[in-house]
Each structure stands twice: as structure tokens, then as C-alpha cells.
From Swiss-Prot:
Subunit structure: Part of the 30S ribosomal subunit. Forms a bridge to the 50S subunit in the 70S ribosome, contacting the 23S rRNA.
Protein name: Small ribosomal subunit protein uS15
A GO CC annotation given for this chain: cytosolic small ribosomal subunit
The organism's place on the tree of life at top rank: Bacteria
GO BP, sorted A to Z: translation
One of the record's GO molecular function terms: rRNA binding
Family note: Belongs to the universal ribosomal protein uS15 family.
Keywords for this protein: Ribonucleoprotein, Ribosomal protein, RNA-binding, rRNA-binding
Functional note: One of the primary rRNA binding proteins, it binds directly to 16S rRNA where it helps nucleate assembly of the platform of the 30S subunit by binding and bridging several RNA helices of the 16S rRNA.
CDD domains found in the cross-reference section: Ribosomal_S15p_S13e
InterPro entries: Ribosomal_uS15 (IPR000589), Ribosomal_uS15_bac-type (IPR005290), uS15_NS1_RNA-bd_sf (IPR009068)
Amino acid sequence: MALTAEQKKEILGQYGLHESDTGSPEAQVALLTKRISDLTEHLKQHKHDHHSRRGLLLLVGRRRRLLKYVAQVDVERYRSLIERLGLRR
């Protein structure tokens, strides 16, 4: 299910560089992480939903590319983001 406006605002408030920040890699990765976790829960219930599984794989790939970009630009921001999101890299 899609994120509501309130959920997006809360996530962007935590991870964005400022209140209305939607474009920074940190904000985008945080939103993707929430969508990935929601979709993962959906797929636990609906194991044969292959269309959503493909969407999940696309989201994971997009998040991986954004994280790779952040790691190349600023390693400290990358490490901080990984720790705050609880990702295991």
C-alpha cells in the first residue's frame, strides 16, 4: 500500500536535510526503505504475488544505487544513514 502524506511528512522530517526536503538522497533512501518494508510484509501474506515481487526488486535496486551514490560522495553521511535506518551494510 502506498505511503500516506502524513507518513511521508514524518519520514522526511526525520531524514531530510530540512523540513520540506524531498530530493536529498537520505530522504529518498528513507522513503524507499519504508516502502520496501511495507511491500515485504505484503509478500509474506501473499506469496504468489509476483507482480509486487518485481516491484520490490526494482525498489531495492533503486535504493542500492542511491546508497552507492551517497557512499561515493560522503562516507560519513553514508555510515550515519545506514546506522539510522538499521540497514546491515
